[in-house]
Each structure stands twice: as C-alpha cells, then as structure tokens.
Amino acid sequence: MERLADRVILVWGFKRSLLAIAAGAFAVLALPPFGFFAAMFLSFTLLVWLIDGAAASPDSGLVGRLWPAFATGWLFGFGYFVAGLWWLGHALLVDQDEFAWALPLAILGLPACLAIFYGLAVALARIFWSDGMGRIAALAAGFGLMEWLRSVVLTGFPWNAIGYGMMPVPLMMQSAHVIGAMGVTALAVFVFSAPALAGTRQGARNGTALAVLLFAAHLGYGAYALYVAPRAEALPEDKRPVVRLVQPDIDQAAKMDNDADRNAIFETHLKLSAETPKNGGRKPDIIVWPETAIPFILTDNQDALTRIADTLDDNQILIAGAVRAEEMGPGTPTRYYNSIYVIDGRGQIIAASDKVHLVPFGEYLPFEDLLTEFGIQNVVEMPGGFSAAVSRHLLALPGGLNLYPLICYEIIFPDEMTSDIEDANAILNITNDAWFGATPGPYQHFQQARVRAVETGLPLIRDANSGISAIVNAQGEIIAGLDLEQTGFIDATVDRFGLEAGTTFPRQTYFWLTEALLILIALVSRRGFISGLN
C-alpha cells in the first residue's frame, strides 16, 4: 500500500491531471443508477494521495502554496461533474436546431464552474494538512462546507453532492434525518478517505478505527430507524387516503410542438385518471398529474374544467401541474408561473401554489437584457420566461391533509424546507424529467427526492411525466412506483402519521457541529505533527 501511495504522490504533469480527472469520474459509479458506493473509497484514497503530492515552494506566498491543491481538487471535480451531469445535454437535443450550440457549455462549461467548489474544498483542506488522520478530517470539513456553499451560492445547484454516494439504499439514508445530506457528505468524505491512511502509516490505526466506527454508526442508526418506523403511530389501512399517480410518458418534443394536439395530451391524462382501480382496490381520493401536465392556460379554458369535473367523482381531488397566467394590466406583460392547481370534483380550482426556485437558462434568463443581445434564450419558450413566486405555502386539501409542494428540481435543495414543513403531512413533488430521456438524470433526481423524505420524516408523493413516479415513506422506502418511460398509473395509500417531522434548524445545527469537530480533529492533528517536527 505504501508503494502504491508513493507512486501516486510522485506522479506529475499530464499523468497527474489525468489521474485526478479519472478519480473524480470513477466516483460517479456510487450515484444512481449504479449505486456502487465502494467506488468512492478508491476515488477519495487517490485524491488524498494526490493532495499529499500537491507541494509548492514555501516562498510562493499563500495563493502559490495552495494553487497545486486547488488545481488537484478542480480536476477531480471536473471529472466528477462531467461524468455525473453529461445527461444535461439531452435536454438541449429536444430542440437541437435551437440549442445544440450550447452542448459544450452544458457538458463541459457547467462542470468546469462547479469544479471550482471542489478546488476550494481541497485548497481549504490543504491549510490544515498534516501527515495523519487530520488531513482526512480537513478534507471532509472542506467538502462539507463547499457542498453547502454550492447549494446556496447564486441560485444554488447541489445536484450529486458527495453524500448521495453514501446513501444508495434506505438503510444508508437514515443519518440524513439527523445531520442532513450535507452532514452525510462530510461523514462520507472522512470514511471514503480513510484507506489513504494505510499508505502513509502515520495515524493509520486511530484514523481507520474512527472511520470504521463512524461507518458502523451510520449503518447502525439506519437499521434502528427502519426497525422502529413500522411501530410508529399510524392510521388503519382503510382510513388512509388513496393517491393515484398518473404517468402519461408524453415525449418532450411533442409537448413543445406548437402544432401538437393539446387536447389529445389532455385526454390522455383524463383517461388514466378514470381507469378502474387494479385488483379491486378502492377508488383514489387524490389524483396527481405531473409538472405542466395541462397543455394550455386552464383558467382560460372552461371546457377543460368541465371535462375534469366529468371525470372526477364529487369527493375526489385532482392535483395538476400547469402554467398559470397573471394579467398585470394595460401596458404590462403577462406574468407566467410554473404552478400546481388543486381542483375539486365540481371542476373548481380550490388551491394553487407557484414555483419559487426557477431553473436558470431553463425557466428564466439571468441578465436577460444583456444575454438576449447575443441571441441567448430560455430552453422553455415562454414570453419573458417564468416568474418566480415570492414564497410557497402548504396546499390544504379537504379532509385535513396538508401537502408541502415542490416543483421539479426544488426537491434537491435541503434548505427549501421552511418552518411550515412541521404542519405538512407529506411532501408533494411533481416534475417532468422527459427532458432527459433514459439517462442517469431522472434516477439521480429521484434519489435526492427520497433523501428529502428521510430528512423531514415525511412521506413523499412524487409524480413525473416520464418517471420515476412513486409513493415513498418517511424512511425513503418505495411503497409503489412506476419506472422510467412507462405509461400508466399507480394507486397507493399514504399514511398521514410517519415519524415526527423535524425542522431545518436541528439538522443545520448538527451539520455545523460535525464541521466544527472535523476542523478540531484537523487542528489537533496538525499541532501534533508540527510539534513532532520541532
């Protein structure tokens, strides 16, 4: 092991850059749809050894001393994000005549920008670097901090945070309920980096023992949470509301075609909603359609509301994604919102919620006045783009069920869960992942949604146009679901009483405590290392 470590530490030039990129790319095997979490042991072991060799002249100043470490982290991140996000280019090929030119920006440009966070994580860790356990603690703290920053800087984009590689199955997701996904990221980097200690001997015994203990605690808490969950207070099966998820699997190109038969798309949703329950099951109390399922402005189409009323029973509720238009008065452009409507059995809209966190360059154009001068436009064709809602609120349904609405990629942001999550009975996530076809993207999106359920202790109702649609319990376990690119529906019950829902505050507190402990370990280790040199 020491010989291998020495070879990696001493590698230089192009081979060093290639090895850093390859290590980052290999780590993606830990993410959906693969879920091979052991891949990250190799990736982070190589990263630690590469940082060991990222030396600079002591006279080169702070920036000069940290630059080799930053470059190593950036190369690792570039490989990770190119391998993990290449599928974003698929969305640009839906209308390739308009957007194919942007493929290099999506496949290489975005990863290059996101990799800056990993470069900063490694540079920060290098400040506390020492020849022992402290260096993997410093690396874990650096990644934890930078993954958190990645979720909040500018509009934020925490997709594929390292921690998700340590949460491939519900058993390994439960720690997120305590320390959140970012806390699991810090834990994961420490554990995945531990084999690197065997290559330098210094601190290997204590560091490895601590990593094994933390990993065992991670698994042990997961087993405990899954064991006690079925014993939590719950409604009897026949008293739980039945939810139908409609998955029409309509091709995105057809949805964007201005000449498409929009009534046919609408009727597809109605037909699936009216299907007889399978195996003699109860009729659904709630029917859910995916994001932007209604292919026209619903409030301008009374016939469509009448068709919905004809399809629903009096006591049924439809929750549907739609574009909402808001007239602003003479001389002011109409505002459009990516919205959720709640419609009762009489065809009346009884509640609505608008998307707060819009997708840059997809639903709105940052610096619009400047960029439109260069011919750059939104992927979603909407005059002026979508408008963002100021805040979101619970969807209160008849019968006392409160849903916390998140549209599309809003579900990937841990900090989107505000304090009113405590009053929710379930998370509602509607999305349209047909943009990305049968690529890893929809699988990654679904995993992050499952982790939000675990974090909050709430069941998840997730409906996607082309999949993956599912009812997920508060422990991230799939109760019922439809896989990618399947057409159909599922009926399942949703228990209103899962584990007690937490707030964002305790998880954030425990995350920062985790960060502080890791930095303390790094400082103590470095102090001991420096003392040993004197």
UniProtKB/Swiss-Prot annotation:
It is a multi-pass membrane protein. One of its GO terms (cellular component) is plasma membrane. Its EC number is 2.3.1.269. Pfam families: CN_hydrolase, LNT_N. The chain crosses the membrane at residues 18-38, 39-59, 74-94, 105-125, 127-147, 178-198, 209-229, 504-524. It is found in: Cell inner membrane. The lineage of its organism: Bacteria, Pseudomonadati, Pseudomonadota, Alphaproteobacteria, Hyphomicrobiales. This is Apolipoprotein N-acyltransferase.
